[in-house]
């Protein structure tokens, strides 16, 4: 070790001779070592020391993690007293109002560099051969203040004199051995747990542990400093333990949760361990300081946690790792149970830099890497149905193109206490895009929110990722009328945007579009084949589906065009919030596309049947735990299981009755007349896949309405390769039979039923050569693209029929 320390001495700058500030101590990953001036735990920090007998002003200095003085972060106009200290919080904030919050983070996964500049020269830096950190919450610094000898500090001392005891990175202790792994057990059982030292533990090593969620400290050790600890666990207990030894570094603790759940485990269980003061302390606690929407900006703090996820009783956790949490939401911060976000990062644990688990295999199969996720309390729906947002998003996103937040129910324990049931949700920010778009990180992302300032509804835009230039240019573009669909397509994915609008308007979500909307796009740095235009991430639709007694007759389309008629419901329908949509709908092609989507969705899945199917899935998953959750929070209307069933049934009835009203709202707004009943394949229920006006139906039966004189274009294929659609039979207001797998007609002024006619055979016309194939009509491939040069053996569409060149 002495040889290493001598080498470090020769590699570092001779700062003492220059009589300037020096880098004295750093921490590459600050979990809970020190809190900053805004009551956060900064990601990392650098301590500067003034070794002189006179005060030094920081304004003459810059600091960076790169040897580039011009781009280095300028320190503020502050004085460091003689032989004094100052902490620079390296959290990538770099804002003037944050004073000592630099615009970079220290590297934790590999060698770390820090440069201190004055007069355009490097006056101090870290030793050149520094390796990656041995563990979080371990500091690296000079043995004593300003000394030339560097090493890992046995005790971190941010803002104070260095401890005088250092060692090499390899002098780090191993984790204690748990004789039993954490698990979920029945209430009437017990666990005999032994904690012991690892095989390579040095002489003098001992075990410290806690059962209250805190990170254990040497002061938690029993007087005899035990080498083994035996615990008989008979109630839900969280154990955090680590090894300590004089002259050695201790990593963060290992944690195991022993959950004695009083019911059959039907949904995943999360166990979170953290210091109780991080939640309930009046000055720094997340729960104690997040009880209103105003706290979102004041107390949006993060706190360190260990988090485990269990998916089956008697089995080990799916993951068990360090992370951070914060409170999520606006008005919902006032709920008795808070929504919480959980973050993974390599600086907590290089081996677990993500939550690597397939949370939603039934909804988003194959998505396994998450930077963060939330446990949501239902938002505005907390004291009512609890699942409105999940029901709405899942119903629609299961059938159409949407960027959305998948959902499952879960139980939460914190420090061994049952907190109730929340919903596991994907995020509605850049982390959603990272998970769903193969790790895409080069984004522009803007969140639109509503604020009431001086009793005036405000439309706020927060640029969370990337730049603002493209978005501002987009606003300039759409603020002017007269653009075509093709022009809008250059700026925004019109198809996806209209899906989002149709969903929110059908379900009566009035907390949108002037709130709860996120625009994103791959920016110019992104390496992707995607168009670099905006899409929307769906979030927080819980104001829909009859929340607060809003009837299914409520006219969201009229609210869009006449917000002054709805003074109690128009906060999200200000002019800045609705200009984009209203100007888009002035284009005939976009308007027709929107009307088609609404009408076709309602006859397919956006109705009582489709919504009810989602409700049944969620109810079946959550019901047993929902009853216990209800008992914990004791809301007045929750008297029995039947009361809960009634709430779910009320939501089904709302959705069942909504289409009739929404069809009429559409007809009234755009003078389309009275909608007429239209069914497709309802009587025969043939096993076919049907496309209606370029919208592929999810169900093989369409049961909805349509408007007089609007074009109906249908195509269909059978799932049986030995059969094909050979024609269509129309009955009702008109009675006619049409040949071919494709049908185009106008909706008559009356009700009609359309049934596909199924014939034997593939339905593919065989043509002898390519010249004959081209002779009698334009060719298209199966995706609808024109084909000029057909290839032998491939199937094409000609005059609505499948053909193949032999």
Predicted regions and their residues:
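Short, surface-exposed terminal/edge motifs of secreted or surface/virion proteins that either
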Residues: 55-57, 124-127, 148-154, 221, ...
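Middle-to-C-terminal accessory/interaction subdomains
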Residues: 158-170, 268-269, 277-300, 305-306, ...
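Conserved ATP-binding subdomain of kinase catalytic cores across diverse folds
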Residues: 272, 295-453
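Short, compositionally stereotyped local motifs that mark structural "simplifiers"
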Residues: 22, 79, 88, 135-313, ...
